[in-house]
């Protein structure tokens, strides 16, 4: 889920924070933090070190954050030493919209994590 500004709009678009839910298309390290390390190149080419992403560079939410002039989102599950001032990423590679099955972090779990997150910040 993402809200974007109309590129033809004359209104200024400002977001103090960005929150993302999804799967591998926008996972910035959630699955990596919860499960196991990925073999290289998980983001090394763009970031210069392994980043836990499902690509060798940025994922779609990184481009959205750049466009909104926000920092790249940290994975909610990779929270040690992380600042969530400009948002958090609840996406998890392999997630589904259906209840338990292939992924333990289906969309209902991501929403539950967001509710917990709101109570803490």
Which role does the model predict for each range below?
Residues 1-121:
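Conserved active-site regions of diverse hydrolases
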